[in-house]
Each structure stands twice: as structure tokens, then as C-alpha cells.
């Protein structure tokens, strides 16, 4: 069955979405219940925002829409107060229900061009890519940014496949006129190499969500990501 038969392609307009951060030094934090353990994801995200995170992605592949919406409703006041966009992974329905600032999709999710038609021109659209061809297609589909990985191997996505390393990131950053983030196994120790390879910043899960002090961990990543 074609994707076009499953969704209404008419756009949804958000009056004042928070834009994707401009410039370099972006630290984009992705939520993960498993990495949080018994700690509150809301508290962790709040700490990350205090530490300087300038984009938050709500990601949870394993919970019903209602639970994801409930978490999003708790996070939105924090991100709005910080002037930071809240981007929903995969779930366009959840993003629209929340009036979130954007959606992020992978290569096996709803096609990016269809997501763009649904969410309208103002919201953020992120796409996961691993090759120049995928990044160029994302640009044609209306992506706001792309994330490139898995760079180093990550415990957060055991099905991500073998790490691709930094060379594809450099090639993608040269090939598309979009902000490029590195993702996959990024830590304070290797974040500088990601930025030197051409990324405008880093997307992280465990490095912040699983850190004993998420605020300090985010601040350290921000310091490294801002360096050239």
C-alpha cells in the first residue's frame, strides 16, 4: 500500500515554531528511558537545557502514543522557556498533537517529502542519513538538517549496524547545504573530531541522558562542540 493512501498530505501550520539552531556548536539531546534508568527524564532534560542543550528530541519507539504525548506535554514548557525546539522522533501524529516544533525520521520511517507536506513549511524536519545520496535526497525532500551516523557505535541503538566512521560525514557536509549533525557513540572525548570532520554539532543519547550529572555533561559537550 502506498504511503500516500495512509496519511492526509494537507499541511498543518504551527504559528510560531522555534527554529532549528543556527551556527555551530549544536548539542542535540535525544531522550531514552533505558539510559535514564530510574531517574526522571523530565529532570534530566531540564538539566540538559540548563547545561546549554539547544535542541531536544522526544524519542521512544516502545510506548503508546498517549504515553509519548504525556511526556511531550511535560517537556514542552521546559523547551519553550529555554527557546529550544522540541522535535519528535518518527511519530508525526504525536508531533501534531503536541504542536511540537518538528519531526525527525529515519530511512525506514514515513518518507521525508510526505512528512514535509504534512507538517507544513515552518516546522523542523530532520532526517537520518549515512550516505551522500541519502543526504541529497533529504535536501530535495525539504529537510531542515540531517544527522549522520552511526559514527562510532552506540549501545542506544543495537540494530544500527556497523559504525561508518567520520569520512562519510565529511563527504555529506561538503555535498549538501544543510546543517549536519554527527550521531552514534559520541562522547566528550570524540566530539571534537566530529566537529572537525564538518558537523555543526553533535546528537547524543547516553552521553547526557545516562550521565551522572546531565547538566555538567551537556555543558562539557557544548564547550567542545563550539570549537573549530
UniProtKB/Swiss-Prot annotation:
Coiled coil: none annotated. InterPro entries: Aldolase_TIM (IPR013785), ThiamineP_synth_sf (IPR036206), ThiamineP_synth_TenI (IPR022998), TMP_synthase (IPR034291). It is an enzyme of class 2 (transferase). CDD domains: TMP_TenI. Its EC number is 2.5.1.3. Pathway: Cofactor biosynthesis; thiamine diphosphate biosynthesis; thiamine phosphate from 4-amino-2-methyl-5-diphosphomethylpyrimidine and 4-methyl-5-(2-phosphoethyl)-thiazole: step 1/1. HAMAP family: TMP_synthase (MF_00097). Belongs to the thiamine-phosphate synthase family. This is Thiamine-phosphate synthase. It comes from Roseiflexus castenholzii (strain DSM 13941 / HLO8).
